[in-house]
């Protein structure tokens, strides 16, 4: 270390630009990651991802009720303008049912009357 008055520390001569070159990409990365994690919501003590689109693209209008293991009815909302009915079959396959089909309406009504055990 020098005690001369004309000596300049290396800290004062370094440019702040390398720090900015690191902070800018880091801040851009964080701005893309934070909104992606905000889509997760805590429901009944577990984490569930909130989809902001309709889940059912194609629907089936005819299925035998004995093939259905469970049924999930998703109301229309900001995520989707229509009601969605998703059935989990006994072979663990999930299919979307047409909520407007008379047969599907009867299946949903029967399950709701039975106490919603297949909800």
UniProtKB/Swiss-Prot annotation:
What are the recorded Gene Ontology BP terms?
antimicrobial humoral immune response mediated by antimicrobial peptide; cellular response to lipopolysaccharide; inflammatory response; neutrophil chemotaxis; positive regulation of cell division
Family annotation (Pfam families): IL8
Molecular-function GO term, any one: CXCR chemokine receptor binding
UniProt main location, coarse = secreted
Under the heading PROSITE patterns, the entry gives: SMALL_CYTOKINES_CXC
- Where is the protein localized? Secreted
Disulfide linkages recorded for this protein, renumbered to the chain, are: 54-80, 56-96
| Top-level taxon of the source organism | Eukaryota
Name the GO cellular-component terms: extracellular space
> Secreted: present as a keyword of the record?
yes
For this UniProt entry, which residues form the secretion signal?
A: 1-33
Tell me which stretches of the chain form a coiled coil.
Answer: none
InterPro entries reported for this sequence: Chemokine_b/g/d, Chemokine_CXC, Chemokine_CXC_CS, Chemokine_IL8-like_dom, CXC_Chemokine_domain, Interleukin_8-like_sf
Q: Which residues form the propeptide in this entry?
A: 34-39
Write out the similarity annotation.
Belongs to the intercrine alpha (chemokine CxC) family.
This chain belongs to which protein, by name?
A: Platelet basic protein
């Amino acid at each position: 270390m020098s005690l001369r008055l004309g000596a300049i520390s290396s800290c004062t001569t370094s440019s702040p630009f390398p720090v900015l070159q690191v902070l800018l990409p880091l801040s851009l990365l964080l701005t893309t990651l934070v909104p992606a994690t905000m889509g997760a919501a805590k429901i009944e003590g577990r984490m569930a991802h909130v989809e902001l689109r309709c889940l059912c693209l194609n629907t089936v209008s005819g299925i035998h009720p004995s093939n259905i293991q469970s049924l999930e009815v998703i109301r229309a909302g900001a995520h989707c303008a229509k009601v969605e009915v998703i059935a989990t079959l006994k072979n663990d396959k999930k299919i979307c049912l047409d909520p407007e089909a008379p047969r599907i309406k009867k299946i949903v009504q029967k399950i709701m009357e039975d106490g919603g055990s297949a909800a």
